């Protein structure tokens, strides 16, 4: 895949850097694994905005992804697909024994025709899913469970991974991309490899319209609002806010710790973000 630089033939294409889709399937998603998804526009069931800057954008179909990887038979990767609902790519896997298909997160380097498996005692290859107790120290994994059988929750975005750095009884030590080191039960599953599309962080959309296509609305500065709308609002002329930067709800934005104290999972965290 990689990235592509657009020629500056228009003002909006000048400086634009996008993710190349070469190598991805151009067809429609697997019909049995996709369904229509209604956009909420950032509103909750009362119609009130709970997530700002969301709305509009192109229609999307949600892809059903196998995050649990409970099948123990071999699967063949049919194609690699773009998914509008997440940053990484998907791999469509076909199982010949019962002629079924499923989507999995595509790891970096996987290609059509590759064999993927899940279960204990299998090879350490990208796309294979097995319990953490069977993964060598130093390996990079993604799609890690926090509870056995609950499905992948850690390291699912583009270019993300966790590294197995040690063992402690029934637990495995994982170092996350944030620098946090935490304990995870060794019976939890993880998939070998790094999530695909690591170059997504280098993209530059080039124009506001491309953000709108993605369903992202503009972000208005607090100092441009009225006092009723933001703590930085109001003032005569163009003022700088008059206080340390805060969110619309008055929470400090520069370095304030937001993690709850005495959280249940504190005992599983050996090193905070570093």
Swiss-Prot record:
PANTHER family: LARGE RIBOSOMAL SUBUNIT PROTEIN UL2M, RIBOSOMAL PROTEIN L2
Record keyword Nucleotide-binding present: no
Domain of life from the UniProt record: Bacteria
GO process annotations (BP): cytoplasmic translation
Region described as Disordered: 30-54, 223-274
UniProt name for this protein: Large ribosomal subunit protein uL2
Keywords associated with the record: Ribonucleoprotein, Ribosomal protein, RNA-binding, rRNA-binding
GO molecular-function terms, A-Z: rRNA binding; structural constituent of ribosome; transferase activity
UniProt keyword annotation of rRNA-binding present: yes
InterPro entries: NA-bd_OB-fold, Rib_uL2_dom2, Ribosomal_uL2, Ribosomal_uL2_bac/org-type, Ribosomal_uL2_C, Ribosomal_uL2_CS, Ribosomal_uL2_dom3, Ribosomal_uL2_RNA-bd_dom
Subunit structure: Part of the 50S ribosomal subunit. Forms a bridge to the 30S subunit in the 70S ribosome.
Function: One of the primary rRNA binding proteins. Required for association of the 30S and 50S subunits to form the 70S ribosome, for tRNA binding and peptide bond formation. It has been suggested to have peptidyltransferase activity; this is somewhat controversial. Makes several contacts with the 16S rRNA in the 70S ribosome.
SUPFAM superfamilies noted in UniProt: Nucleic acid-binding proteins (SSF50249), Translation proteins SH3-like domain (SSF50104)
Low complexity composition bias: residue spans: 36-48
Entry GO CC: large ribosomal subunit
Record's compositionally biased regions (Basic and acidic residues): 263-274
Family in the record: Belongs to the universal ribosomal protein uL2 family.
Pfam families reported for this sequence: Ribosomal_L2, Ribosomal_L2_C
Protein's organism: Wolbachia sp. subsp. Brugia malayi (strain TRS)
């Amino acid at each position: 895949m990689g990235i592509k630089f657009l020629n500056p033939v228009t003002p909006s294409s000048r400086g634009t850097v996008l993710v190349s889709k070469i190598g991805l399937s151009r067809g429609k998603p697997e019909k049995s694994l996709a369904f229509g998804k209604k956009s909420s526009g950032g509103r909750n069931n009362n119609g009130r905005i709970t997530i700002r800057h969301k709305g509009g954008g192109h229609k999307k179909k949600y892809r059903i992804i196998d995050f649990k990887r409970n099948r123990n038979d071999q699967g063949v990767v049919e194609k690699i697909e773009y998914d509008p609902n997440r940053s990484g790519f998907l791999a469509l896997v076909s199982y010949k024994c019962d002629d079924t298909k499923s989507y999995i997160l595509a790891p970096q380097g996987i290609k059509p025709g590759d064999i993927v498996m899940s279960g204990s005692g299998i090879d350490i290859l990208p796309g294979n899913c097995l319990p953490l107790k069977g993964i060598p120290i130093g390996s990079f994994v993604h799609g890690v469970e926090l509870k056995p059988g609950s499905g992948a929750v850690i390291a699912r975005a583009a270019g993300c991974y966790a590294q197995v750095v040690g063992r402690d009884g029934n637990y495995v030590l994982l170092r996350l991309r944030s620098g946090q080191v935490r304990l995870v039960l060794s019976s939890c599953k993880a998939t070998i490899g790094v999530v695909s599309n690591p170059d997504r962080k280098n993209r530059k959309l080039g124009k506001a319209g491309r953000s709108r296509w993605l369903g992202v609305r503009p972000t208005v500065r607090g100092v441009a609002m009225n006092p009723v709308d933001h703590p930085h609002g109001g003032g005569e002329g163009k003022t700088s806010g008059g206080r340390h930067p805060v969110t619309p709800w008055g929470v400090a934005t520069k370095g304030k710790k937001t993690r709850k104290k005495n959280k249940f999972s504190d005992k599983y965290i050996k090193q905070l973000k570093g």
